[in-house]
Design a protein with these regions (language model features):
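Compositionally biased linear targeting/interaction segments
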Residues: 1-205
């Protein structure tokens, strides 16, 4: 199975490389965004789907370059509310990734909080960017049900990644345009290179 997965990844990478030579603007009208014909490799059938990470909200946008991104925070809180979740979860998500041990007000949680709950955790609080959105299940106020609601709209890229206006999911665009003017200082951009193939499923690993 690994052999076929690697072959599919290689084909997806080649297609993205070809697209990069044509232009640096990703949109859903390009060849990579269209369903690819099923490939047969050694009598096995391989399906390939390429997705743009920038069509989702990157949870690591909340804290980057040593500070909180207020625009990203307002957006994430609105996304939480739109899915019936508490906006306070955003504070716990921030505390999970920032490097200090000071819990934020309104729902924040550092190592002391998790230790006090007696909750068994596979790892301690990360104090670094999220590696996978599955880590969110460990965060105060979040559970698997909440993650399933958010998963289609999230990704975890270890650097700042603005949403791509050409590929962003409609639900996220609706939230963006309804943000207060003072919070809407980080419009999504139209040129990003953060594509992934179907095997990585940027929304949820």
């Amino acid at each position: 199975l690994k052999e076929y997965a690697l072959a599919g990844e290689a084909m997806a990478t080649n297609l993205i490389a070809q697209d990069s030579q044509v232009n640096q603007v990703d949109s859903l009208t390009e060849a990579w965004a269209k369903p690819l014909a099923q490939q047969t490799l050694n009598q096995a059938k391989v399906s390939i789907k390429i997705d743009d990470d920038a069509s989702r909200f990157n949870v690591n946008n909340l804290y980057h370059d040593g500070k909180v991104d207020d625009t990203a925070l307002a957006f994430f809180q609105a996304l939480l509310q739109a899915n019936g979740l508490s906006p306070n979860i955003a504070m716990a998500v921030l505390d999970w990734q920032d490097p200090d041990s000071d819990a934020r007000a309104d729902g924040g949680a550092e190592a002391a909080y998790y230790q006090s709950t007696g909750k068994k955790m596979a790892m301690g609080i990360a104090n670094q960017p999220f590696i996978s959105i599955n880590e969110l299940q460990q965060v105060r106020g979040m559970d698997n049900e909440g993650l399933q609601k958010l998963a289609p709209y999230l990704t975890a890229v270890p650097y700042y990644l603005p949403m791509n206006i050409n590929t962003v999911k409609p639900e996220l665009l609706t939230i963006l345009v309804n943000l207060p003017t003072e919070a809407n200082g980080n419009q999504p951009q139209g040129s990003n290179r953060a594509d992934s193939d179907d095997n990585s499923q940027s929304g949820q690993d």
